[in-house]
Amino acid sequence: MPIDPLTPNPPMSRLSTRHSPHPQPLLGLVLMGGGARTAYQAGALQAIGQLLSRTSGPAQAFPFQVLAGTSAGALNATFLASKAMEGLAGLDELAHFWTHIRTEAVYRLPQTPLDKFSRWATAVGLLRSARVHAAAMDSLALVNTLHQAIALEKIDTALQSGVLQALAVTASSYSSGIHWTFCQTRDGQPIPWSRPGRRAEQQPITIEHLMASSAIPFIFPSTPLWVDGGMEFFGDGSMRQISPLSSAVHLGADRILAIGVSQPQRASLSTSARAAGRPSLGTIAGHAMASVFHDTLEADVEQLARINQALDSLPESVRADLPLRPVRVLTLQPSASLDALAQAHAHTLPRPILRVLEGLGALRGSGAALASYLLFEPGFISALMALGQADVQARADEIQSFLAPAQAHPVR
């Protein structure tokens, strides 16, 4: 059954896969990518934490045992893994992290003193950076931000304690074309899955993995990682991600909450976009970004629905002999246009970035989609988080019912 992002209650789906290796049911959290837009996830998860706190008390354990993230969603998943020992407070800390982030803490546009006064000089600097680094922006600031925010050693503590079972981060190899999932698990055993164009490898998650997973094509530089006995260069994990739910399923999740950041519709912008005629470079770039980041989750859930329908048509005696298990999936997507939000806040970007986006036509109409991935500024971040909180509150009963079996023991 297709997901309509405008529908207030997208359906739960079930995926059939091999039996879970874990004796206890596991709840997975899958976080999709989308640059600054993933602040929506922080707001939604904070609201979910508040829901659980009201029903089970603030001492409830961290609710998710399997975490999987892609691109900026991988940053969120890894941050949460490092805070899992703190229980529900970890969800609040993710929101606190996003509340204090700024564009300068994520990336900058390489500049010379002349670039500050000339749009042409800025354009030349952009081309120079693209030639040298195959990327428009310098993301070194994000390396420093992540090192300060994420205590990687605490991930292993959470795994060994049993609070977590697994963390997975995805990235796409420019060198081989393979979409890799890097897994850090409680037992540390090799992850035995390999599919055409998709592979997994057991590795402790590092900041380098996060930089690779979040390296938006053309925007941020690729990151080298050692994999399968050799060095390969990686970019954003959303590229070539055919099945974003598969890593959580392979790692044993029996139920999955998947939070995307896709654009429901551009109804508020469509009339002006038609009147504008030929799309700007910013509009085309935003459309390409949307294809990279947002189409795969919907397609994956649609595929699950088709598989479920086929399985439901089989006699019970046949299904009982299959080496498969049901996996319930609940999806959460923004109920309002993130492009429109970005258009309202784009003027708050640092001046050099603003100048570039203005030149691309990415600050008006449907071109604002591009700005929405790069707008790490307080007004936009706050609006995204508020939307995530409101969307959870609007579906509170449904979400609480879905999460109820995972409500566990108090934090030790």
How would you label these PLM feature ranges?
Residues 22-28, 36-140, 144-146, 183-195, ...:
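Patatin-like phospholipase
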